[in-house]
Amino acid sequence: MASKRKASAMATEPEEPVDPADELMFLNLGGGNEVGRSCHIIQYKGKTVMLDAGQHPAYDGLAALPFFDDFDLSTVDVLLISHFHIDHAASLPYVLAKTNFRGRVFMTHATKAIYKWLIQDSVRVGNTSSNPQSSLVYTEEDHLKTFPMIEAIDYNTTHTISSIRITPYPAGHVLGAAMFLIEIAGLKIFFTGDYSREEDRHLISAKVPKGVKIDVLITESTYGIASHIPRPEREQALMKSITGILNRGGRVLMPVFALGRAQELLLILDEYWGKHAEYQKYPIYYASNLARKCMLVYQTYVGSMNDNIKRLFRERLAESESSGDGAGKGGPWDFRFIRSLKSLDRFEDVGGCVMLASPGMLQNGVSRELLERWAPSEKNGVIITGYSVEGTMAKQLLQEPEQIQAVMSRNIAGARRGPGGDAEKVMIPRRCTVQEFSFAAHVDGVENREFIEEVAAPVVILVHGEVHNMMRLKSKLLSLNATKEHKVKVFSPRNCEELRIPFKTDKVAKVVGKLASIPPSLKEAKTGHDGPLPSSTEPQLITGVLVQNDFKMSLMAPEDLREYAGLTTTTIACKQRLKLSAAGIDLIKWGLEGTFGAVEELPEVKPKLEIVKSENGDTKMEEADEELPHGDDVVAAYLVMGCVTVRYRASGEVELEWEGNMLNDGIADAVMAVLLGIESSPAAVKRSATKNPHTHSPLPADKNPHSHLTPEDRFFRLCMFLEAQFGQDNVSPIVEPKLPPLSPTTKAITSPSEETAKSSDVKSDADADASMDVSEEDEDEQQLKARERAEVERLERMGIPKPGVRIKVDKMEAKVWLEDLEVECANKIFRERVRAVVERAVEVVAPLWG
C-alpha cells in the first residue's frame, strides 16, 4: 500500500510579496476553453493590449460577442487583429462603433484588405437570413465608418505605441495572418493567434522569432495533442472521396470559409483536374459573393507568399507571354478549371459537380442552402475540410444525424414539420454522406508542442481550444517538466477568469552626459578594464536627475536634460523685502546666529558710511552725502544655511533672495519668521537696550546670560527637568547626606565641640565620671550628626546645595546623589530609567556643578 505523503512535503514555499505593478494580468473575454469569439486582454505596468475581437459562429446577436461588459475598454491602448476570420475579427466594428474604446487598431495590409469585404459580406448575409432569431449587432454603415480607423503594418517591422512595442510575424494560417511579439517595460509576450507550421502551396509557415527571449507565450490549443495525417496522404484521401462521389453521379459540397483554406483547396483541385482529364467534364464552382473581389487581393499580395506560389507565378507568366495572351493573365490565381459563382440564381443544378461554398460552419448562406437542397439524396456527399466549432451545423453533421433543420428554405420536397407541434421547425432528412479531412491550417499536438519547446518561455497560456483538447495539451506540457531544470508554468484560464502572474524586473538606469565621464567604482574597475585600480575603495555616489521614458531610465546632470531628454529646466529666483524700523545689522546677525548657527558674511560692495554718535552714546550708520547708484546701498550681506541671502540696506530695508525649491522655501520662511519677530523678542529687546560704556576701550565680548548660574539655580533646573519626567509630587530633595564609611582618618576628624569636650575630660575626674553616664547610643547619634554636618559643609563648598534627590513612582523609590550622580534603587529597570533621565538632565543643565 502506498504511503501517505506528509503535509510538509506538499506545502509550497512562501512567496515574497509582489508589487501589483509587477504583475501581468491576463483575461479572456472570449476564446477561453472554447473555440470562437477570440478576445484576450493583457495588462502590465499600466499598459493594456487587446488581442483579437471575434464572434462565436454558433451564436447570434449579442450572445455571439465576447464578454465586453466585464472589462473597461476605454483603458485599452492597442488592439491587435491576428487575421480576418469571423471568430477573430467580426466584432471589431462593434468595438469601434458601440463601445468606449479609444485605442488604436492594427492588422497587416492583407488582413485589412480582405477584412473590409469579408465583414461587409457577413452583414449582408445576416440581413438576408430567414432565421427569425438572428439579429445584427452592427450595420454595414458602422463597418464602413470605422474601417478608416484601422492601421495596417508589415511583417517583421517594429512599431512603438504608447511605450508598447509590437512586431508582427507570419503565422501561416491564412493570407495576412500574423503572430505578434509585444514588449512592455522589457517583458516580452508572444501571441500566436491561429498558426500553422505545415508547408502548403501558397503560405509561409510560422517560425519562432530569432534572437528573442520570450517571457510569456500565448498559443492556441485547437487540436490538443491530436496528430494530423501527413499532407500527401490527406490530399490523396480527399481526392479519392471527391472522385468517388462524382463517379456515383452525385454532387460534392465542401463548406469552407470564403477566404483562407478555400484558396489552398482550389490550388489542389485545379492541379488535380489538370492532371486527370477524365474529371474535367465535372465543373468546380467557388460559390462566394467575395470570390472575385478577394481573389484580386490574393493576386496583389503574391510577394508575401511562399516560394511555391512565386515559382508558379513566374511559370504562368512565361506561358502567357509565349502564347501572346494579354498582360495580367496566367497568374497563379487564374484557375483553369475553377468557375466563380456569384449567386445560386445562375447555377444550373444538373449533373455532378464540386461546390466550394461559404460559410464553413453551415450556419447560413450559400453552403447552408445547398446542404438543405442536397442532403436528401444519398448520391451526394458533404466533405468537411476545416475545424468545426461546437454548436454549429458542421459539428452536428459529423455525428451523421437522420435529419437536419431547415433554415434557408422551408418548402423543400421531402421536408416535414418537427415533433412537438412547432410550426416554425421544419426538418429535412439527411441521406448524403459526410466525411472529414482536416485542412484547417492549425498546428496539431506534435507541432504545437515542438513550437512551445522551441520558444522556451517560462510561462505558457493556452487559448482557442475546447476544454478536453486544452486539458490534454496542458497535462502533456506539465509532464515534460519532470526532465527540466526550470519548470514551465502552464495556464488555461476560462472566460472572464482573471489571471495574475508576477514578473520582477531589475530597474537599470543608464548614466549619460557629464555623469558618464565619472570613473567607475573599484568593483566595476576590476571587471570592466585592465588598467590600474583606483586607490579609493569607498562606495561611489552619483547625484543627478533620473528620467524615465518608455520604461527606460537615464541618469544625467540637470544641464544635460535638454540634449538627452529633450527637457528644459527653469530656475526661479525668489525675493522678499521687509522694512525694520529699529533693528540694526548687529541685532539681525545676532538673531540669525541664534537660530541657524554660524552665518556666512558675503563680500558685498558697501557704500561709504559715516559713524554718528547719538546723545545717549548709541552709534548708528548714516549714508554719505554723495549719491550712490541704486542697489549699492547694501550695508552687509549674509548667507544663511548656504541658500538664503540676507541683505541689509542703509535705509533699514532687509532683502531676502533664494533659489526657489521645496527646501529653500522652508528655510526662507524660517528666516522671515526670525526677522519679523526680532524687534519684539524679549531677548532681543534686552540685548538692544544695553547701554554702551562711555569709554574708548574695546567692548567686552557678549556673554551668554546662562553661563554664570548659582548652585541653587542649577539645582532648581535639575529638579524642574526631573519633575517634567516623573511628576512634580514625585521629586523631592534629600537633606541627609550619604556618609562615607568610617576610617582612621575619618575618626581623627572631629568637630570643635568634640575637642572642647575632650579638654574638659582631661581637666577633672568628676566630669569624666559624668560623661561615663552618657549612653553609647547618644554618643553614636551625636557623632553621626557631626559627620552629617561636616559632609553637608563639604558639599556646599563644592557648589552642591543639596546632597541628593529622591524620586518616588508608585512603590518604587530611587535616590540620586548629586556629587557623583549615583542612583540607588532596588528595582533594576527603574534604576536604569532614572539614570538615563539624570544623564540627559546633566547634558541640558551642564556643566552642572563645574
UniProtKB/Swiss-Prot annotation:
One of its GO terms (cellular component) is mRNA cleavage and polyadenylation specificity factor complex. SUPFAM superfamilies: Metallo-hydrolase/oxidoreductase. PANTHER family: CLEAVAGE AND POLYADENYLATION SPECIFICITY FACTOR FAMILY MEMBER (PTHR11203), CLEAVAGE AND POLYADENYLATION SPECIFICITY FACTOR SUBUNIT 3 (PTHR11203:SF11). It is found in: Nucleus. Residues 685-708, 732-784 are annotated as: Disordered. Its EC number is 3.1.27.-. InterPro entries: Beta_Casp (IPR022712), CPSF73-100_C (IPR021718), MBL (IPR050698), Metallo-B-lactamas (IPR001279), RibonucZ/Hydroxyglut_hydro (IPR036866), RMMBL (IPR011108). Keywords: Endonuclease, Hydrolase, Metal-binding, mRNA processing, Nuclease, Nucleus, Zinc. GO terms for biological process: mRNA processing; secondary metabolite biosynthetic process. Residues 767-781 have a biased composition (Acidic residues). Residues 744-754 have a biased composition (Polar residues). Zn(2+) 2 binds at D87, H88, D194, H464. This is Endoribonuclease ysh-1. Zn(2+) 1 binds at H83, H85, H173, D194. It comes from Neurospora crassa (strain ATCC 24698 / 74-OR23-1A / CBS 708.71 / DSM 1257 / FGSC 987). Residues 755-766 have a biased composition (Basic and acidic residues).
